[in-house]
Amino acid sequence: MNRIDKTLEKLKANRKKMLSPYITAGDPYPELTVSLMHQLVKSGADVLELGIPFSDPMAEGPVIQRAMERALAHSIHCDDVLNMVRQFRKTDTETPVILMGYLNPIEQYGYDLFAQQAVEAGADGTILVDLPPEEADGVSRVWQKHGLYSIYLCSPTTSAERMNFINQHANGYLYYVSLKGVTGSDALKLPELKAQYLQRKAQSKLPLMVGFGIKTPEMAAQVAEFADGVIVGAALINEIIEAYEAKKDPLQASGALLSSMRQAIDNIGSMV
């Protein structure tokens, strides 16, 4: 069984909500990434999203764009990211790792080789932001051959027909994009988000995890009251880079934010 499914089953059995942090591989410097991954797991992460740096990250706001620029300045590419997963797996064989990014670097790498190497390294799935499921047939077949999961995006504007299509092709869970715009966007409107989320949830065979715009423990808890889980990216990267630039400990800073989110989510999750 894929680690993602094992984790989701365990969360369901324990009536807990998923917490998934996103970091960009190689940011702020390559030697920190594996330590960050372990720190986030210690601080309550259920699933890790590891970003593959790309020069044109169209769905990302300025925080993650700058993170990718910093990683690319260290010449971080697919092989480096996979090596980070390998290093992580030496001491953590259970936490799912999702590789998140854009199609171009993987296309250049070669779909079959990438899937083979990703699974060998210990990755469990991908989120390819610019590959809609309707155009993913070739990639999906390769991923299935190697046992790599495809995690797809859905949003408030996703139609019932498209949700039905996604249901037929997705694995694990769906990434529910809470806002129009880019990662790190402001102004989550919770009543509207809840109503739209529940519409998509009723149409989905898989758990829906909410990402985009979740910045604080309070916000994470409010979303987790109705959602299957939350994904945090830009807020976490802000903590990491601010600590690094202030010559403080990025591990402590990122761990503190994620621990506070974990605690806030668990405090409401036990009542759901």
Swiss-Prot record:
Source domain of life: Bacteria
Main EC class the enzyme belongs to: lyase
PROSITE patterns listed in its UniProt record: TRP_SYNTHASE_ALPHA (PS00167)
Documented EC number(s): 4.2.1.20
Residues at the catalytic site: E49, E60
Catalytically driven reaction(s): (1S,2R)-1-C-(indol-3-yl)glycerol 3-phosphate + L-serine = D-glyceraldehyde 3-phosphate + L-tryptophan + H2O
GO molecular function: tryptophan synthase activity
Alphabetical list of InterPro entries matching this protein: Aldolase_TIM, RibuloseP-bd_barrel, Trp_synthase_alpha_AS, Trp_synthase_suA
A Pfam family annotated for this UniProt entry: Trp_syntA
GO cellular component: cytosol
Pathway the protein contributes to: Amino-acid biosynthesis; L-tryptophan biosynthesis; L-tryptophan from chorismate: step 5/5
Alphabetically ordered keywords of this record: Amino-acid biosynthesis, Aromatic amino acid biosynthesis, Lyase, Tryptophan biosynthesis
Task of the protein: The alpha subunit is responsible for the aldol cleavage of indoleglycerol phosphate to indole and glyceraldehyde 3-phosphate.
PANTHER family: TRYPTOPHAN SYNTHASE ALPHA CHAIN, CHLOROPLASTIC, TRYPTOPHAN SYNTHASE, ALPHA CHAIN
Family to which the UniProt record says this protein belongs: Belongs to the TrpA family.
Assembly: Tetramer of two alpha and two beta chains.
Name of the protein in its database record: Tryptophan synthase alpha chain
Annotated source species: Legionella pneumophila (strain Paris)
